Amino acid sequence: MKSFCFSVLVVALVLGVSSEAASAAKPSRATRLAGARSFAFAIGDGTLKGNLGRRYGRFDLVVVDGESAAARKVAAIRRSSGGLVLAYLDVGTIESYRGWYNAAKPFRLDYWADWGEWYANVNAGGFRSLILRRVAPAMLSKGFDGLFLDNTDMAETHPVQKPGMRTLVAGLSRLVRARGKLLMAQNGASANWPLRRFYDGINFEDVSFSYDFDRHAYFCRLAGAVARAQKNIRRYLSAGLKVTATDYLAARKTKETRIAVRNACSAGALPYVSDINLRRIPARPFLCH
């Protein structure tokens, strides 16, 4: 009996050591983000349908809609690629199709016609509590590796909202980091710079190509604008953040896509190109060589 007990104890100890070693060997999410070589910004309609493993299996970093993605779909993407999956969460505007719209409705400011949504009064404690206590935790509980925040730069057009946005971003940073997870934002090179310590990464849209909502047309950015965008990319890289770049083009624009990828890569960002509604997913990731 003593011999049997001793054998069980030895096996348990070996398994315990092996488990600890495996855990120690597994890189952190921050390390995996730093090593990511490909990126997909996939929040458009239809991006969560079909065979997600096949669609996203080659991407190291994938952003999908945090509300629409069920836990099983998050797991399917993570399992197929072994990569990171972040939940898209708009914290600077209020979208009428969200499940929390009625709760957020009292905090609406002016209407943003381009996207059919309202800027949010982030100075209001009630709005911040809604995001911090209800919306963000619900997303993280689905197994996401972190959050991807949109419209944190709304303070550029609504400067009075700066204190509230800083408080909200700081709170979200604490929320994700307490869980060992990640926080990314996008755009707002000036607005997000004072908040950079709260982020692990940032995405810059419209580096080389963008979309004009008034003309309903894609257009090429001027050389000076591209140079400024590249300067911002390098600035955030120097601060230790992972940087991605998203450009918008119509389908089958092969030459323009090459230009967008080259401009992003030359500045040090992971490139991505899609339509303005982010519905088009490339068969293969865009890579820097």
Feature roles, as predicted:
Residues 25-289:
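Glycan-processing catalytic domains of CAZymes
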Residues 1-4:
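Positively charged n-region of N-terminal signal peptides that target proteins for export
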Residues 7-16:
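Bacterial N-terminal signal peptides
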Residues 19-25:
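Signal peptide processing junction and immediate N-terminal pro/mature segment
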